[in-house]
UniProtKB/Swiss-Prot annotation:
Its EC number is 2.7.11.33, 2.7.4.28. ADP binds at residues 151-158. It is an enzyme of class 2 (transferase). It comes from the Bacteria. It comes from Burkholderia ambifaria (strain MC40-6). GO terms for molecular function: ADP binding; ATP binding; phosphotransferase activity, phosphate group as acceptor; protein serine/threonine kinase activity. This is Putative phosphoenolpyruvate synthase regulatory protein. The keyword Lipid biosynthesis does not apply. It catalyses: [pyruvate, water dikinase] + ADP = [pyruvate, water dikinase]-phosphate + AMP + H(+); [pyruvate, water dikinase]-phosphate + phosphate + H(+) = [pyruvate, water dikinase] + diphosphate. Bifunctional serine/threonine kinase and phosphorylase involved in the regulation of the phosphoenolpyruvate synthase (PEPS) by catalyzing its phosphorylation/dephosphorylation. Transmembrane segments: none annotated. Keywords: Kinase, Nucleotide-binding, Serine/threonine-protein kinase, Transferase.
């Protein structure tokens, strides 16, 4: 039976869940995740304890609980449950208060209550920009891009662009490299004025073939030999044009995005 893990928060639970995933991924074990957001009253805290205790009885073992409850009374209630309770605020915020000699705001959901901030507006603008400039569908205002991802079709450009926009407020356009570009041996004309903003994504040809077969099975587009040709040509073009690039084959979107941010030296971070 899988161990049960509860994500308990007085807000959306995004912070607690992200932290939990980071910790749990260190173990070669599957878990059953139960999300309990908006636990923002004592009544809900008591109901949370009941659910945790029921899971412990059902599983025959203590549950694991990750919490970001800032209300101390609610937190104390949850800590009385039959579980290993990992309290992010107690473990991290309180030591920081002592070190900084400064009291934290203890504002519920503060990290995500940014709907009226400039940071939020920046991210929304970046998302709209990335959607408008996905897969080369528009060349307008490309000069406003922070980065322009290039690579063959299905190499990971779109999800990476959107992640950069949503997480970091980066205006990320993406543009496909197609067989016609390889025949000419040149970058698409729309990209040449923005060479300093280009970053390339490549991928293992066999993996590319598998991905394309899910979309268009049995087609030339997905054939292994065609994928090898496109990847070889794309990488040769990027080397020739002096474009920095990486292989997305064994990297998560988070890893790809972090590498891109380091390479383009764009120190933009969302909190």
């Amino acid at each position: 039976m899988l161990p049960t893990v509860f994500i308990v928060s007085d807000g959306t639970g995004i912070t607690a869940e992200t932290f939990a995933h980071s910790i749990l991924s260190q173990f070669d074990q599957k878990f059953r995740l139960v999300r309990l957001p908006f636990v923002d009253s004592l009544e809900k805290a008591y109901a949370t304890v009941e659910k945790i205790n029921d899971a412990a009885v059902h599983d025959g073992r203590r549950a694991i609980v990750f919490t970001t409850l800032v209300d101390s009374e609610s937190n104390d209630i949850v800590k009385r449950s039959n579980a290993l309770v990992l309290d992010m605020f107690q473990r991290f915020v309180e030591p920081l208060e002592q070190e900084l000699e400064l009291k934290s705001s203890h504002a519920m959901g503060r990290g995500h209550q940014n709907a009226d901030t400039e940071e939020y507006k920046t991210r929304i603008e970046a998302i709209n920009f990335s959607l408008a400039h996905d897969d080369g569908q528009s060349n307008r205002n490309l000069s406003e891009a922070d980065v322009i991802l290039v690579g063959v079709s299905r190499s990971g450009k779109t999800p990476t662009s959107l992640y950069l926009a949503m997480q970091y407020g980066v205006k990320a356009a993406n543009y496909p490299l197609i067989p016609e570009d390889f025949e000419r041996g040149k970058l698409p004309s729309a990209l040449t004025p923005h060479r300093d903003k280009l970053f390339g994504l490549s991928i293992d040809p066999q993996r590319l073939s598998e991905i394309r077969n899910e979309r268009r099975p049995g087609s030339k587009y997905a054939a292994p030999e065609n994928c090898r040709y496109e990847i070889n040509e794309a990488e040769a073009m990027m080397r020739r044009e002096g474009i920095k690039w990486l292989s997305s084959t064994h990297k998560s979107i988070e890893e790809i995005a972090t590498t891109i941010l380091q390479e383009i030296r764009l120190d933009r971070q969302s909190y």
